[in-house]
Amino acid sequence: MYRIGDEELEEIKKVLQSKQLLRYGDPSRGHLQEVVNFEREWAEKIGSGYALLMSGGGTSALASALIGLDIGPGDEVIVPGYTFIATASAVLNAGAIPVIAEIDETLTLDPEDFEKKITPNTKAVIPVHMQGLPADMDRIAGIAKKHNIK
């Protein structure tokens, strides 16, 4: 088990003082550099290929998932037209383009419209389950697999 010492505490302090605790935005911009540096150094320290700072919320989880899938500028991510703002904002924060697809009678992503919205730049889809109703994941996953979409 790895123990956190003075060196690690100093690095954490730098991140906290940067007032940028999460990886939102363009990591090449100065205000995110402490976060990016900490993530890289922490990953090396624990022997991992990557590490991401995040809060425990769903917005951060979406952002982290997109980063983990290597979604970035120029990529398109299909999202349902009826969802919480975090779905599209996570895509924007990754530098990608949210493409809004219609919903069906269950208020979730319409699989047919999802397939119509696919372009060569489409890299991912974020289905959202709404008001206790699940999206048609069998159809959505089948379409995604057919078009090599994450």
Residue map of PLM features:
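PLP-dependent aminotransferase-like
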Residues: 67-150
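Conserved PLP-binding active-site segment in aminotransferase class I/II-type PLP enzymes
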Residues: 1-59, 63-68, 72, 145-147
